[in-house]
Every structure is written in structure tokens, then in C-alpha cells.
């Protein structure tokens, strides 16, 4: 084999580098600023220029040394070349040179070492990083596979939740996207945007990562066993992560002087909207399931099966049926909905507590408006006047939004009127509305409300089994709302 090619020399296909020889091209060798030889094509492509016709993994390279004996005869002796010391992908390959004749057979690589790869697969998978020596640099730019493919290695995390770590719902960046959380990996038929699912499910279930929010499909089999439970468990996990984030945040510390302009109120409202849409979607799935079961039961003989009566309740209001299809709204789903609602109450309580902490740190003096803000110009109108204390107005708006979102959740879950916390707080602030004590008991409600379906009955049963925890969460939230509103009245001079 020829010696190292001189600068600006055109090599034959046999003596060209591995990359050019695989494409049946002739190398045009140039001299780099570092003094090494490099092919023009490899230099432009920013890939290692490797000269060597044989793969070390398939055939051992041997060298031939010629010695002259005393009798004048030349003896040829074949010696195996030194083994190639291949380091990991973070370091350049190094060779232990066995003889000077071996180094003369192959041109030196870009990095100054021998350019013989261990095998062709290592060259294609980026074992040897590209060094910027041909452009005057010395630090590695990137690996060859990244240069060829034009991108980094794919993310191997199944969830990509950056909520979850960027994959957990604790990340605030998630809430800057669309509010719906289902991906577009299902069929092409689209659904209503008002129905969303939590983001923590894997793509194996046909659900995309949480970072990519999109409307989910209404034909998702929520009535199948286990689907609704997995969705609610995922959402419950996101609720607890958000609760932990708010509890450990800087706003929880009384000595902190941090303002509330960057408070993540949108994440809490997003959770309320998600739970509302989940309740609506599950009720629709339940009604569709009841309609299909009722239609099939009418076609069957009365001696083989009993007709399904959704208004008939036995053993505490739980409807019974002899059909083989299990109801979508079973006891576990109802209790998980109840658990999500209670956790959402705790999240809202923490938010209101942070508002209270901030208001405690504010001065008690009544704010006074400057003359410039009172009389901006002679043609000013009432709508042109700026609020005296904008942070207090923002807090009041946030409290109203939280109560409205909780009221929507309670309506979507069809909760009994006695345990609707947000509705009770709203009614107490409105003298003309009905108070919680005037609401009819759940068992005495009209037939349309009492016998909607077994889902409402099961939720009510879940409330009865966990009444103590519900009362604590509801009373704490009510106290926080009243405390924040009272402090706002004092600070704003109302």
C-alpha cells in the first residue's frame, strides 16, 4: 500500500478513505492546519477521515518486515500489528504503533492517531468523535452520528415528563400550552375540546406524552374495565405533585418578601378544569353504556335476564343488574373521583393560605392615590382610572376564579348539595341565594337528581364513608376564603 498521500493529491479508489471508497469516489487529500492529512469531502462533512481497507474485527492486519541475512538473501517475516486500543466514544481512538513500517502504510487521521476503526459499525454509530483540528480547533465538536443524522440521540424516557421531569405537573411550562392533555396518536376522528385526560399515561395506552397537549378522542373506551381507573390514578398523582410543590414553595414562608406576580395560579385552575372535564366525560360514557345495556336487555328474553332499571336502588342506593357487562362507574372510580376532589380542595386551601401570608406582610396603612392618578386629564373617564392597589385586585380575582372552578367541578361530579363547599361559600357571600341548610337532603331530592344513575349514588356513598375528612377539608377552605376576603377588605379600605 502507498505511503501517506501528499497534500492536494488525488488518490485512487483503492487507496481512498473508507467513506469515499464506499461511494466509489477518489479522495482529494488536503493538509489541515494541524499538519495532518484529510480528505476534502470528509473535511466538508465534518466527519473523521479514516484510511484503511480492512476492518480490524474481521481480519487481523499483519505487517511484513524484511531482513537481510549474511548470505544476502532477503527473508520476509509476517508479524501481527499491534492491537488497536479503542477508547469510549468520549475520547479519540489511540493506537500503539508496533513498527515504523506500519505507520507508513496508512495516513494519519484528523486527530493525529491511526485512522483504522475497530469495525465499520463503530464508525457508523459515532464511536469516534469528530475533532475540529481541520478548522484550527482542538475541542471535539460532536460525534459523527450526530453530524450525519443532524440531531441528538432520541429521548429514551417513556414519559418525557421533564410533570414528568419536565414530566411532572409540577413544571409550570406545561400550563402555557393547550389545556387538553391527550396526544394525537389515536385515530383521525376528532373530539370535543372540552374533554381532556391527565398527562401521565404512557404511549403504550395510545396516549402521548404530557408535554404535547391536544384534544383526546371521545371514543376512548372509558367504559372498559381499568381505563377510567388508570386515568384517575394518573390525575391523582398530578394533583399530589402540585400540592407538594405549592406547600414547599417560597410563598409558604412567612419571612419571604417574594411577590405574587409569578404565582402559578394557572396550574391550579388547569387542574380544576381537568377534573371538571373528566367528570363530564365519565358521565357521558356511563350514559352511553346504560343506553346500550338497556337496548340489549330489551331484545333478550325475560326468562334469561332481568331488565335493567336505572332508578331502582338496592342496598344503599347501588343498582343491581344481572348483565355481564360491568358498569363504567364502579365503586373504585367513584371513590377516586372523591379523592381527587378532596385533594383539589387541599390545593386551593394552600393557595388561599399563601394569599393570607402575603397579605399579612403588607403594611396596614390604607393606600392613598396620588393626585396624578386621580386627575390624569380633564377628559378622563371612569374606565381610564387605574386601580390603587393592583396586587389586591389580582388576589380577589384569583379567589373568585378558584371558587368558580370548584363550583364547576362539584356540578360536573353531581355531588350532593350538602357537601358542595364552593357552592356554600358562594351562597354565604350572596344574601339572596339559598343557604346550604336550606338545600334538600340527597335522599329527598327530586327523582331526576336522586336517580340520575348509580354513579351519583356511589359518590354519595363514598362521601358517607369519609365524612370526617370531607368536613375538615371543607371547613378549612371556608375559613381560608373568609380570612382572605376580610383581609382584602381591611387592606383595600372597603
From Swiss-Prot:
Broad class of the protein's primary localization: nucleus
Compositional bias (Low complexity): 60-69
Keyword Nucleus attached: yes
Residues in the DNA-binding region annotation: 17-49
Subcellular localization(s) per the UniProt record: Nucleus
A molecular function GO annotation: DNA binding
UniProt-recorded name of the protein: Pyrrolocin cluster transcription factor fsdR
Organism: Fungal sp. (strain NRRL 50135)
Region named Disordered: 57-79, 287-323, 429-449
Keywords: DNA-binding, Metal-binding, Nucleus, Transcription, Transcription regulation, Zinc
GO cellular component term, pick one: nucleus
Gene: prlF
General function of this protein: Transcription factor that regulates the expression of the gene cluster that mediates the biosynthesis of pyrrolocin.
CDD domains on file: GAL4
Tree of life domain: Eukaryota
Residue ranges, compositional bias (Polar residues): 306-323
Amino acid at each position: 500500500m502507498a505511503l501517506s498521500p501528499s497534500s492536494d493529491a488525488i488518490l485512487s479508489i483503492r487507496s481512498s478513505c473508507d467513506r469515499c471508497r464506499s461511494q466509489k469516489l477518489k479522495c482529494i487529500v488536503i493538509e489541515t492546519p494541524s499538519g495532518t492529512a484529510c480528505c476534502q469531502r470528509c473535511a466538508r462533512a465534518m466527519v473523521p477521515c479514516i484510511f484503511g481497507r480492512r476492518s480490524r474485527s474481521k481480519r487481523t492486519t499483519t505487517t511484513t518486515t524484511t531482513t537481510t541475512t549474511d548470505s544476502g538473501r532477503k527473508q520476509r517475516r509476517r508479524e501481527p500489528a499491534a492491537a488497536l486500543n479503542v477508547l469510549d466514544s468520549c475520547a479519540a481512538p489511540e493506537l500503539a504503533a508496533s513498527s515504523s513500517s506500519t505507520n507508513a502504510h496508512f495516513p494519519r487521521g484528523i486527530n493525529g492517531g491511526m485512522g483504522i476503526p475497530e469495525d465499520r459499525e463503530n464508525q457508523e454509530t459515532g464511536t469516534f468523535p469528530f475533532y475540529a483540528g481541520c478548522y484550527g480547533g482542538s475541542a471535539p465538536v460532536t460525534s459523527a452520528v450526530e453530524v450525519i443524522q443532524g440531531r441528538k440521540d432520541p429521548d429514551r424516557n417513556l414519559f418525557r415528563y421533564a410533570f414528568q421531569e419536565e414530566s411532572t405537573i409540577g413544571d409550570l411550562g406545561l400550563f402555557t400550552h393547550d389545556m387538553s392533555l391527550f396526544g394525537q396518536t389515536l385515530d383521525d376522528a376528532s373530539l370535543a375540546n372540552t374533554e381532556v385526560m391527565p398527562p401521565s399515561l404512557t404511549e403504550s395506552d395510545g396516549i402521548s406524552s404530557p408535554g404535547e397537549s391536544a384534544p383526546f378522542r371521545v371514543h376512548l373506551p372509558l367504559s372498559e374495565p381499568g381505563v377510567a381507573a388508570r386515568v384517575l390514578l394518573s390525575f391523582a398523582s398530578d394533583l399530589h405533585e402540585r400540592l407538594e410543590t405549592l406547600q414547599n414553595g417560597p410563598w409558604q414562608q412567612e419571612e419571604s418578601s417574594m411577590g405574587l406576580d409569578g404565582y402559578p395560579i394557572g396550574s391550579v385552575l388547569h387542574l380544576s378544569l381537568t377534573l371538571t372535564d373528566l367528570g363530564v366525560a365519565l358521565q357521558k360514557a356511563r350514559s352511553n353504556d346504560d343506553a346500550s345495556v338497556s337496548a340489549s336487555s330489551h331484545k333478550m328474553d325475560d326468562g334469561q335476564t332481568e331488565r335493567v332499571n336505572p332508578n331502582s336502588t338496592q342496598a344503599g342506593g347501588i343498582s343491581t343488574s344481572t348483565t355481564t357487562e360491568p358498569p363504567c362507574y364502579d365503586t373504585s372510580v367513584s371513590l377516586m373521583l372523591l379523592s381527587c376532589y378532596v385533594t383539589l380542595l387541599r390545593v386551593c386551601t394552600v393557595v388561599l393560605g399563601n394569599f393570607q401570608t402575603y397579605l399579612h406582610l403588607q403594611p396596614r396603612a390604607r393606600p392613598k392615590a396620588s393626585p396624578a392618578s386621580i386627575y390624569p386629564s380633564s377628559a378622563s373617564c371612569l374606565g381610564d382610572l387605574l386601580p390603587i392597589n393592583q396586587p389586591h385586585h389580582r388576589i380577589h380575582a384569583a379567589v373568585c376564579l378558584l371558587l368558580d372552578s370548584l363550583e364547576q367541578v362539584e356540578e360536573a361530579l353531581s355531588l350532593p348539595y350538602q357537601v358542595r363547599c364552593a357552592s356554600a361559600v358562594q351562597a354565604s357571600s350572596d344574601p339572596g341565594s339559598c343557604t346550604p341548610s336550606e338545600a334538600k337532603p340527597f335522599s329527598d331530592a327530586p327523582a331526576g337528581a336522586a336517580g340520575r344513575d348509580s354513579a351519583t349514588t356511589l359518590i354519595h356513598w363514598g362521601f358517607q364513608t369519609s365524612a370526617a375528612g370531607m368536613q375538615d377539608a371543607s371547613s378549612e377552605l371556608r375559613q381560608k376564603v373568609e380570612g382572605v376576603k376580610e383581609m382584602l377588605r381591611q387592606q383595600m379600605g372597603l
